[in-house]
């Protein structure tokens, strides 16, 4: 009886903030793992998404966007997380946006040139490029920057050519035993995923109003006698004015955030969820490395 060969490897998804890395990861996995929002810097942890298909297991590392800006402790730690992801993988997917090329893209490229892993260039949001005639010269410019394994124009939002990326990934997975059972889609705990869902809703419903000085701590996550979960989430902000913003007029904003977060949690955990949210002012947390460690920002560096 012949034993079927299995293939397994780690793939880093890298790029400057807000180019669509999290959306691409979610499409590759077929469901939502990494939070997506139109604000830059929404991914703060290295989330591992796992996709197993027959003998192939691809383990995706969703990095925070690499930044030139390193003034705040949180930005320094996010850059460290992103850079460390690049060093220990079989393959890198470098995501750029349409015909835009910025100093941040250049910085990511320089880090990739120093690395050993082959790089797929995913040119995202090509469906949004107004001047289609600009696309080909831009792709030629990108091709001249380094020796990419492949250059794939994609739309992570619609899923266009995402299967092409997945196919290239499968071809480059080394022969190895699978790291995770086939039904795993992430190595993160439910508690962690609950905090990410709440944070996504904060980003979505507060938009540009709220600065990045907001995070979520899950104070309680227990199963109840109804077979569901009781979850208490604490939203930390830096100033009293931000607290009022999160709560909204007569509590309307936090109520909406809670309702939408609960829906996503119930879908993800496949069980009823009772969710309660509080807002607390904890000034200076984004500048304090000790506070960031206690909130889990450096647990995987």
UniProtKB/Swiss-Prot annotation:
Residues covered by region (G1): 15-22
Record's subcellular location: Cytoplasm; Cell inner membrane
Top-rank taxon: Bacteria
UniProt membrane topology term: Peripheral membrane protein
GO molecular function (one): ribosomal small subunit binding
Entry keywords, A to Z: Cell inner membrane, Cell membrane, Cytoplasm, GTP-binding, Membrane, Nucleotide-binding, Ribosome biogenesis, RNA-binding, rRNA-binding
Chain spans, region G4: 124-127
Domain KH type-2: 206-283
Subunit organization: Monomer.
Biological role: An essential GTPase that binds both GDP and GTP, with rapid nucleotide exchange. Plays a role in 16S rRNA processing and 30S ribosomal subunit biogenesis and possibly also in cell cycle regulation and energy metabolism.
Record's protein name: GTPase Era
Annotated source species: Salmonella arizonae (strain ATCC BAA-731 / CDC346-86 / RSK2980)
């Amino acid at each position: 009886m012949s034993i079927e060969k299995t293939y397994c490897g780690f793939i880093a998804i890298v790029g400057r903030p807000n180019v669509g890395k999290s959306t691409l990861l979610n499409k590759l996995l077929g469901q939502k793992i990494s939070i997506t929002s139109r604000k830059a810097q929404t991914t703060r942890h290295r989330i591992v998404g796992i996709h197993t298909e027959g003998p192939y297991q691809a383990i995706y590392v969703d990095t925070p966007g690499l930044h030139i800006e390193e003034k705040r402790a949180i930005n320094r730690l996010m850059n460290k997380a992103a850079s460390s992801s690049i060093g220990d993988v079989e393959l890198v997917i470098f995501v750029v946006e349409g015909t835009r090329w910025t100093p941040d893209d250049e910085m990511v490229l320089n880090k990739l040139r120093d690395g050993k892993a082959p790089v797929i260039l995913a040119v995202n949001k090509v469906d949004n490029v107004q001047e289609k005639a600009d696309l080909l010269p831009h792709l030629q410019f990108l091709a001249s920057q380094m020796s990419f394994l492949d250059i794939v124009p994609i739309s992570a939002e619609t899923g266009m050519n995402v299967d092409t990326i997945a196919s290239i990934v499968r071809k480059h997975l080394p022969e190895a035993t699978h790291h995770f059972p086939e039904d795993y889609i992430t190595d993160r705990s439910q508690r962690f995923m609950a905090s990410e869902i709440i944070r996504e809703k904060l980003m979505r419903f507060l938009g540009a109003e709220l600065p990045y000085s907001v995070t979520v701590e899950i104070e309680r996550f227990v199963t109840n006698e109804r077979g569901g979960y009781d979850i208490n989430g604490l939203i930390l902000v830096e100033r009293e004015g931000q607290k009022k913003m999160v709560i909204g007029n007569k509590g309307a904003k936090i109520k909406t955030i809670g309702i939408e977060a609960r829906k996503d949690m119930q879908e993800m955990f496949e069980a009823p969820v009772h969710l309660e949210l509080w807002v607390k002012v904890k000034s200076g947390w984004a500048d304090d490395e000790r506070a960031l460690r206690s909130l889990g920002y450096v647990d995987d560096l």
